[in-house]
Curated annotation (Swiss-Prot):
Known function: Plays a role in the inhibition of host DNA replication in the infected cell. Targets the mini-chromosome maintenance (MCM) complex and blocks the accumulation of MCM proteins and their loading onto host chromatin.
InterPro entries: Herpes_IE2_3
The encoding gene: UL117
The protein's name: Protein UL117
Organism encoding this protein: Human cytomegalovirus (strain Merlin)
Family assignment from sequence similarity: Belongs to the herpesviridae U84 family.
Keyword Thylakoid: no
GO biological processes: regulation of DNA-templated transcription
GO cellular component, one term: host cell nucleus
Database matches in Pfam families: Herpes_IE2_3
Keyword annotations from UniProtKB, A to Z: Host nucleus
Region (Disordered): 59-83
């Protein structure tokens, strides 16, 4: 290794030092660059005694010997070729390949899903918690739901009765808060459910009154749906075909919470808190905050969220400024004025920023907002499914804004979602 000196390198160009900078002291750069040309052997990077940001190595014709050529051997110097590369300050040419290999080893791909439900793709005999991952199950589930036919006023049967159980208000004939004028034939119920699920039904399906319902050992995409018919109020004078929400329409709903993903029970408090806030406040006032201590895992979560529709994502690394304790006088003055809400404005004084440094804390943070309540809840569901894989890396928090915030392109979606009303009988 040859040390830096005028005998070994040739300074081709050097920019002047810039002493003044608006950056903090620990982030201030000298903005000085030199271009050097080695004359013999290797060159140490960075050169000794030079405060530079980048060093450019320029090949020369006299790099094999330090002795000047004789007069008879002098030839016109060919123009210098452009530098092949620019090495950052502190880079060693000898360790450059090792550095690249180290950087490549850091490019770790995190698999955000693991086998969870269903059957193993290679071994169908394996079933249980270590068989199918949630992403495959949710994809197949949503694909199956999209295939179902949504009944409208024209295609719905003439007499349909849907019982939603004891969860809906009682005292209404027909069950589930449906109008009393709806037919109560069990054959029509089975036919409607089969038409929604797309399963052929026998001509005369007879269900015994004392039949017992057994829990299937695995998820069946054709057995855990039930149709919910939204009837137009009887007081509406308009015809059902042109009534509110397009008249009588049948939608597919899950049968119960047994088919929820496994992470739903683990992060139950998060879903309940988001649902509570969205019942009390508008979706434009609720935001989801995620913190992560690993940059690669944070980028994996960010990439997954950016594949969702109708969401806004703000992500970055947390910065902390210079830490300075408060004087007892400042603490006493602040607490004295803030004891009385009517005297809060009396303690406001001009603030002079005096922090001389800042640095990164190593924590990555992300704020997610949705165009509608459903979009925000979908973002929470996706985050919970990914965070569940690495609970020691992520942290989920729900924040309530004092002023609503929504992206301008999301306004039409928001207005359409909020204008939809479920008709009551």
């Amino acid at each position: 290794m040859v040390m830096f000196s005028q005998d070994h390198v040739q300074i081709v160009y050097g920019s002047t030092r810039i002493c003044k900078s608006l950056a903090p002291a620990n982030k201030r750069k000298t903005h000085r660059t030199i271009v050097v040309a080695p004359r013999r052997g290797f060159l140490r990077i960075p050169p000794d005694g030079q405060d530079v940001n980048h060093v450019k190595i320029v090949p020369t014709t006299t790099s094999s010997s330090l002795a000047p050529p004789r007069d008879d051997e002098r030839r016109p110097t060919p123009p210098l070729r452009p530098p092949l590369t620019v090495y950052p300050y502190g880079t060693s040419l000898i360790r450059r390949s090792a550095r690249d290999a180290k950087l490549r080893s850091k490019l770790i791909v995190f698999h955000i899903t693991r086998p969870a439900l269903g059957q193993h793709p290679q071994n169908p005999g394996i079933s249980g918690p270590a068989a199918m991952d949630h992403s495959e199950f949710l994809t197949s589930f949503r694909r199956e739901v999209d295939r179902q036919t949504v009944l409208t006023a024209e295609s719905a049967p003439a007499t349909v009765e849907v019982c939603l159980g004891d969860a809906l208000p009682g005292g209404v004939m027909g069950g589930g808060g449906l109008p009393a004028g709806v037919g109560s034939a069990s054959a029509a119920v089975a036919a409607a459910a089969a038409a929604v699920a797309g399963v052929p039904v026998a001509a005369n399906p007879v269900m015994p009154a004392t039949a017992t319902v057994t829990t299937p050992p695995m998820i069946d995409l054709t057995s855990h749906h039930r149709p919910l018919t939204l009837f137009t109020p009887a007081s509406a004078a308009a015809a059902p075909a042109v009534a509110t929400n397009g008249g009588n329409a049948t939608y597919i709903l899950p049968a119960d919470c047994r088919y929820a993903p496994l992470f739903a029970s683990k992060y139950k408090y998060v879903f309940e808190e988001v649902s509570r806030l969205m019942r009390l406040h508008d979706s434009t006032a609720v935001q989801l905050q995620i913190s992560a201590s690993c940059g690669n895992a944070f980028q994996a979560l960010k990439s997954a969220l950016l594949k969702l529709h109708n969401v806004t994502v703000l992500a970055g690394q947390q910065l902390i400024t210079q830490t300075m304790p408060h004087t007892p006088q400042a603490v006493a003055t602040f607490k004295f004025f803030h004891q009385d809400p009517n005297r809060v404005l009396d303690c406001i004084r001009p603030v002079v920023p005096r922090s001389t440094s800042y640095h990164e804390t190593g924590v990555y943070q992300m704020w997610v907002s949705g165009a509608t309540k459903k979009d925000l809840f979908d973002a929470v569901t996706l985050c919970a499914s990914i965070v569940e894989k690495q609970p020691d890396v992520f942290n989920i928090n729900v924040s309530l804004l004092t002023y609503p915030s929504i992206a301008a392109p999301h306004l039409p979606l928001y207005n359409e979602f909020t204008s939809f009303r479920l008709p009551t009988s």
